[in-house]
Amino acid sequence: MLAHPEVVDRIRSEGHTVAYHGFNHDRNSKRSIQEIKRDLLSAPNSLSKRYYRPPYGRLSWWKATAIPSDWKIIMWSWLSYDFDQTLSIDQLVSRAKNSIRPGDILVFHDNNNTKHRLKELLPPILDFIESKGWKAEALD
């Protein structure tokens, strides 16, 4: 976000929510409450809202006390497994068609290990969502 603000601007201009996942992808179970607080307080100002999804989707109730009251924790309800290189695109799409439900919050990963797969994975999943009459939309 800090290195490429133009990418963040484009993401936002295309209707997506820019939220926070942590400056590093450290497991919160290995971090103190103070470290979590410091991380959130250093979050970029370019966020759409103060939404936070903890790395690995894990945050104990005790560590959740580190989250400032003006932040909202947003978890996912459906994990794409796009990072699992043992699963083919066809397997991932089939899994999506059998398990995505209305209202689900889907998680995909945009990193060096998944970016080549997302180009193939997202279109059939988005087509499936549209064929059901559902709508994929931003959180805000």
What is each residue range found by the language model?
Residues 18-21, 52, 73, 106, ...:
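Conserved, mostly hydrophobic/aromatic
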Residues 1-4, 26-34, 53-60, 81-87, ...:
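Acidic-and-aromatic substrate-binding clefts and catalytic sites of carbohydrate-active enzymes
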Residues 58, 64-97, 134-140:
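His/Asp/Glu-enriched short active-site or ligand-binding loop at hydrolase and phosphoryl-transfer sites
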